[in-house]
């Protein structure tokens, strides 16, 4: 087993322990607690795969971190913080849109890559726009907060959201989830369009001229994927 893999796991275990202490002392917010639960499940899975005990790994991780901190200067810390890119947040939806409750007449749900896809299969022949709130790092979608599908009159007919109890998701997970959602809605002859932010940061597409939300190749891939699932 690669020593760097073991060391990385040990440090992750110890840092999770520190975050857990903050949570136990009510020194963190709800998103922090959500990430803590997701990361706990991920660490258990990694520990099982690597055949490492979590308690032992945590203690070893503490030693590694302490050794690093002994040689760390305040100046080095300032340089590291200044050079680290910070994610920025994109908000297609207002607070009202992202928090509004909605209901499905013919519900369909699917879990993919740590994301829950929900859609109302009773919706037919509608023009639908996808909007999302998410963080961006290095000009690419990093973490999805919520994606919802709206009809022209503002009704919510579908949604993609992270599952708190599961590990985090990747950009590819988000793309796949959007593909499932688009395919499911287009199955009932709905016309789907993604916001410019989704196009740009999920697929790297700029759509200033009002073109289709996805390139033909991506559309064909999604259609094939969904046909096998619907």
From Swiss-Prot:
Residues 209-230 are annotated as: Disordered. Keywords: Eukaryotic host gene expression shutoff by virus, Host cytoplasm, Host gene expression shutoff by virus, Host mRNA suppression by virus, Host nucleus, Host-virus interaction, Inhibition of host innate immune response by virus, Inhibition of host interferon signaling pathway by virus, Inhibition of host PKR by virus, Inhibition of host pre-mRNA processing by virus, Inhibition of host RIG-I by virus, Inhibition of host RLR pathway by virus, Interferon antiviral system evasion, RNA-binding, Ubl conjugation, Viral immunoevasion. Upon interferon induction, ISGylated via host HERC5; this results in the impairment of NS1 interaction with RNA targets due to its inability to form homodimers and to interact with host EIF2AK2/PKR. InterPro entries: NS1, NS1A, NS1A_effect_dom-like_sf, uS15_NS1_RNA-bd_sf. Residues 223-230 are annotated as: PABPN1-binding. GO terms for molecular function: protein serine/threonine kinase inhibitor activity; RNA binding. One of its GO terms (cellular component) is host cell nucleus. Its main location: host cell. A motif (Nuclear export signal) lies at residues 137-146. A motif (Nuclear localization signal) lies at residues 34-38. It comes from the Viruses. Residues 180-215 are annotated as: CPSF4-binding. Inhibits post-transcriptional processing of cellular pre-mRNA, by binding and inhibiting two cellular proteins that are required for the 3'-end processing of cellular pre-mRNAs: the 30 kDa cleavage and polyadenylation specificity factor/CPSF4 and the poly(A)-binding protein 2/PABPN1. In turn, unprocessed 3' end pre-mRNAs accumulate in the host nucleus and are no longer exported to the cytoplasm. Cellular protein synthesis is thereby shut off very early after virus infection. The dsRNA-binding region is required for suppression of RNA silencing. Homodimer. Interacts with host TRIM25 (via coiled coil); this interaction specifically inhibits TRIM25 multimerization and TRIM25-mediated RIGI CARD ubiquitination. Interacts with human EIF2AK2/PKR, CPSF4, IVNS1ABP and PABPN1. This is Non-structural protein 1. It comes from Influenza A virus (strain A/Mallard/Alberta/88/1976 H3N8). The gene is NS.
């Amino acid at each position: 087993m690669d020593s760097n893999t073991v060391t990385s796991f040990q440090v992750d275990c110890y840092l999770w322990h520190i975050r857990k202490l903050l949570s136990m002392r009510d020194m963190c917010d709800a998103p922090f607690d959500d990430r803590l639960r997701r990361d706990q499940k991920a660490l258990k899975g990694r520990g099982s795969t690597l055949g490492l005990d979590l308690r032992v790994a945590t203690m070893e991780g503490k030693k590694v971190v302490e050794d690093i901190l002994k040689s760390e200067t305040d100046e080095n810390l300032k340089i590291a913080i200044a050079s680290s890119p910070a994610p920025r947040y994109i908000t297609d939806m207002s607070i009202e849109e992202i928090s509004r409750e909605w209901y499905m007449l013919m519900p369909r749900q699917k879990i993919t890559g740590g994301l829950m896809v929900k859609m109302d299969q009773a919706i037919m022949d509608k023009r639908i726009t996808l909007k999302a709130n998410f963080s961006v790092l290095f000009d690419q979608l990093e973490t999805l907060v919520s994606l919802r599908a709206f009809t022209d009159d503002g009704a919510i007919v579908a949604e993609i959201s992270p599952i708190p109890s599961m590990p985090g998701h990747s950009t590819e997970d988000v793309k796949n989830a959007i593909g499932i959602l688009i395919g499911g809605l287009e199955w009932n002859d709905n016309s789907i369009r993604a916001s410019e932010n989704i196009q740009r940061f999920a697929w790297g597409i700029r759509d200033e001229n009002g073109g289709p939300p996805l390139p033909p190749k991506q559309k064909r891939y999604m259609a094939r994927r969904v046909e096998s699932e619907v």
